Amino acid sequence: MPKITGEIHDAMTGEVVQARVQVISPDGGNVAPTDAMWKVGPGEPFFYSNGQFSLDASRGYHRILVERGTEYPPWQKTIEVDGSSDSVIDIQLDRWADLPDRGWHPGNTHIHYDEKEKDPDRRLAYDSRVEDLRMTAVSILKRWDLDYATNKYPPGVLNEFTDTHHHVQSGEETRHNQDPSNPFQIGYGHVMLLNIRNQVDP
């Protein structure tokens, strides 16, 4: 079976970068590497790529969409797989803005992985890189008896996921619920506690 192989680069630096990838086959289905990790949540389905990917493809036209954070326009292309050889794609992502150079750094401080997440370490390693986030925080959350996968991380900096360009930490979400028995009455909302040394119990 022929393959589609791609490598994703920042067009300015030439660096191989992680991104979200969607490949639509001729029959309209989504195809991905056999060991791919899929995005969770609403919206279009994507799989996560560490900058390189290879997947089995059928003959015909395939639509490819690659996204990375908010500072890169989506990259799109339709290619034809004729079955005679593998298709190799060089994906160059053009950065439309360099906000960190202006002192603005993207981040997400409100992330939970629910009890259905089977590989939180792998997902957390992807999340900050694929979305090009300088700062990422998962939060401990007590909600009913749900075993949130991200509750396993201790408060503070998560060194195994942090590097020079990505700060990843675990904090805590505290909720003001008017009626704990009614999840739809959330009172004044949520407060995210960051840079804490210990979990704060109600």
Per-region residue spans from a language model:
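A short, amphipathic beta-strand motif
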Residues: 2-11, 21-23, 62, 91
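Short, ordered, surface-exposed loop/turn motifs in non-cytosolic proteins
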Residues: 12-38
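A short, solvent-exposed beta-strand micro-motif common in secreted/extracellular proteins
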Residues: 21, 45, 59-70, 128
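Short, surface-exposed beta-strand/beta-hairpin micro-motifs centered on an aromatic residue
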Residues: 43-46, 50-57
